Amino acid sequence: GAVFVGVALFLTLGVKDLILAKRDERYLALVVILLFGTGMWFFADADAGGSLFQTLILGAFFFALAASYVRALGENRELPAELRLHLRASALVSALLIAEWTWALFLLPLSEAHRFMLFFIPAALLVSFLGEYAAGGPSRRSVLAHASIFIGSLVLLLASVEWGM
């Protein structure tokens, strides 16, 4: 069911005159929506994420989404092969960071909602950052905005947790 909806949404966003059009913003929106749904599904079950194996599978899914987004950006903007390879390596490093971050979240006494938001915000920011990197490199303003959003949301979410031993 969910796979069918994902494919239907992808085709609805990308098909124009029976040709798959290159649409960067819509592809980014699709990737973020899929990250949101996957994160909700992953963190909904309290027993789902405590193991390293399951968090690595989540990281592999993040890599698949980020790598496909980077590949679509590379094809759309006709980037050199070396930059495409570098972007793919950046997607892999981002996926490993997300997997480690997710695994670390299970070490903290957080609710499923807090874990989900602490997963989703950095994951969406990393995908957005990869898109800006493919567009010629992020500006200082963009780096500052991404870092501010991450740190601000981290502080707000961790401040809202009832820390009881």
Give the positions of each predicted feature.
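Hydrophobic alpha-helical transmembrane segments
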Residues: 1-6, 29-35, 56-61, 86-103
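Hydrophobic alpha-helical segments and helix pairs
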Residues: 1-40
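C-terminal ends of transmembrane helices
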Residues: 8-23, 65-83, 127-137
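Helix-coil boundary and interhelical linker segments in multi-pass alpha-helical membrane proteins
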Residues: 39-52, 102-114, 161-165
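Hydrophobic alpha-helical membrane segments
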Residues: 94-98, 115-130
